[in-house]
Amino acid sequence: FSRADIAWGARIKAFLEDRLEKVRVFWPHEIAPCSAGLQEIFQANLKALNEADLMVAMLDGSQVDDGTAWEVGFFFSQGKKVLGLRTDLRRAGEMEGARVNLMIECSCHSISESLEELLDRMQRLIY
């Protein structure tokens, strides 16, 4: 991830934690140290996904990050809700009208275009 991606993710985490009282936000960059081995990082992320009730997937970029795509599919297969966040104005889907790859888009309960819209959708699901 780029420094800008990491900073954006940290901003999203802080935004949600400041506004949602009963929510604990898992942030992948805090779950396992970067110095950890591949298996350790994978297992830590898998544990966090299994413990989570709701997922926010950052979908910006010309293509959804490979790891994010895997996590969205895994989470969706467990019957849990994924809320996408795509602030990128570019379209990355291969189908007309799709914002991202159709498998990702259809796995998301919703895709928000701003933090405020994401917060509103989360509040409706949680409270």
Predicted regions and their residues:
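Conserved catalytic or regulatory cores that recognize and/or transform ribose-phosphate-containing ligands
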Residues: 1-127
